[in-house]
Amino acid sequence: MESTETWVNGEFLNGKVDRMDGTDKYVRIVDYKTGAIDDSAVAYYTGRKIQMELYMSELKGERIPAGVFYFPASVSYKENEEGRFRMQGFMNGSEEAVLCGDTTLSKDNPKVTSEFFPSALKNSPNTTRVMEEETFRDFVDYSVHVARQGCQELKEGFIAATPYEGKCGSCKYGGMCGFNKESCTPRKENTIDTTAIAEIARKKKELRQMQITVELRDL
């Protein structure tokens, strides 16, 4: 188990990662899950599921992100156990990163899909989860922008209940949050893909760098 801590907008954040695998060049993190897994791009985009990517943004250091995964750690017995070790999540689809992540793959059979994650060396079956290296870097960095915005809103006193549609039914805090489903309209989650999320992060990063440059120039 790997501990991580970082500062976001002046706020100290810390947590623990179940597992971290790495080489001198690449790093991936894995979280073991016994319950349901929601690893959709939409959940990440809206900020409901940014924990793993936020950990990666800090733990990677100078290394290149190779993947952020949830590992289904169910103890139930099933008749068909095919794919029981298949991790769910998002990853760097560069040839070198894929080979580092699964040593059973070979350049001699580049279209063979890994048993452990949704990728092959060529023609990966799920391109929404497998990204080019730079795109995946930006995708991971998006979590920092969401955390930064959340911290800023809390500092400004914004604590209103603004749930997404369909989430109140399973919320343990429904009796105390004050959200009135009769008079208030829950937010809707719009479909988005990983490339669009990465592009948003890239533009936000460029804007932030421009702001820092202007501030330094004015000193």
Q: Which residues make up each language-model segment?
A:
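Structural signature of nuclease core domains in nucleic-acid processing machines
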Residues: 1-219
